[in-house]
Amino acid sequence: TGEMFSNQCGMTGHVVGEDDPVLLYATETALQIHITELSEPLRELYVMAYTLPSTLEYIYTNTAQKLMQIFAPYMPGTELKDFYELDIASGGITRGFMAQHCNLYFSIEQKLQRYLSCCMTIYHVPQAKQDEVIKKVLALDLHSAAERIIQETISRAEAGYRAALGLPAEE
């Protein structure tokens, strides 16, 4: 779970090309949602990660500090425990949006817009900032970035499998 989440974080800065923490958060989470639309096995892994108590606890304890750094300016007086608790709410939203497939009535753009709005509202991001961030995220080529992340994930898994079996690495 840790590797799955940390590997995409490095790609986010390259995709966005900016250092606005709210935009980076929105892009990172939008990439997760996009990945689940492109790969059913990864959708199952993400949904499981946001369902099982052991992986949920890992997610919450490892993201609360990061969430505090991003959103504390919008929530004066909050403490780390507040962001841990709010991550429980945003994690539930994330799981729900990951589990629901896009369809004729619910495009990826609609899904990302609604998802990001829900999460940023939890963290008291002002509406004007939400609109700005969502517009920028929807303008990104998340499809290509998600495909690259999926391919890199598959390559790492294959390399790990080959190493575990004592097979030479593919060239």
Where are these regions (language model features)?
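Short, flexible helix-adjacent loops and helix caps
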Residues: 9, 13-17, 41-44, 71-76, ...
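Hydrophobic alpha-helical connector segments
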Residues: 9-42, 52, 60-64
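Short, hydrophobic secondary-structure boundary micro-motifs
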Residues: 43-48, 128-132
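HTH DNA-binding helix-turn interface
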Residues: 1-3
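C-terminal peripheral helix-coil segments that are non-catalytic and often amphipathic
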Residues: 69, 73, 103-171
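Short, surface-exposed acidic
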Residues: 19, 76-83, 128-131
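Amphipathic alpha-helical packing segments from all-alpha helical-bundle domains
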Residues: 27, 49-102, 106-118
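Phosphate/oxyanion-binding loops and surfaces in catalytic or ligand/nucleic-acid-binding neighborhoods
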Residues: 35, 39, 93, 100, ...
